[in-house]
Amino acid sequence: MDAMQVIRQSLAHSAWADTKLFAALRDNPQLTVAWREYNHVLGAAEVWLARLERRPSSVAVWPVLSLGQADALREAVATGYERFTSRLEPGALTDVIEYTNSAGQTFHTAIGDILLHVALHGQYHRGKINLLLRQNAAEPAAADYIAFVRGVPAAVTPVPELTHAKARE
């Protein structure tokens, strides 16, 4: 794979993983800390997309979203990155853009670095979300990259509390 293919594949995986996490969280609306992390993944991705597209962001970096708003933003972010990268020429990954962060500081960063950051940042927070799910006896989402590539879930260690509860039923 060339660099553009890696970026596109990483962002496609992110969209897929966000869908998997949404499904796991939808069944656990009481996990407010996990929802806060999930909404941040979406909010940060939208903020970065807005910077890349040189427009104001429609949400904050740490938005407070309803279930419906989170689902709509998840879809908008996935579609937005697909659209953005489909129009991007391979050489544009090294183009540098200027933007202002949420603290008001100005930075200059290559488009490829921003796109890679979006994918990696999401993975970091998805791991935290899965840990929060597991700590609350909820089934984590199998959102590993290899599961995305294979099209089947990676091996998942059962949540002991769930395993015992099902055995008692």
Language-model regions, residue ranges each:
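Short, contiguous alpha-helical
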Residues: 4, 8-63, 102-165, 169
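Helix-adjacent hinge/juxtasegments
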Residues: 57-100
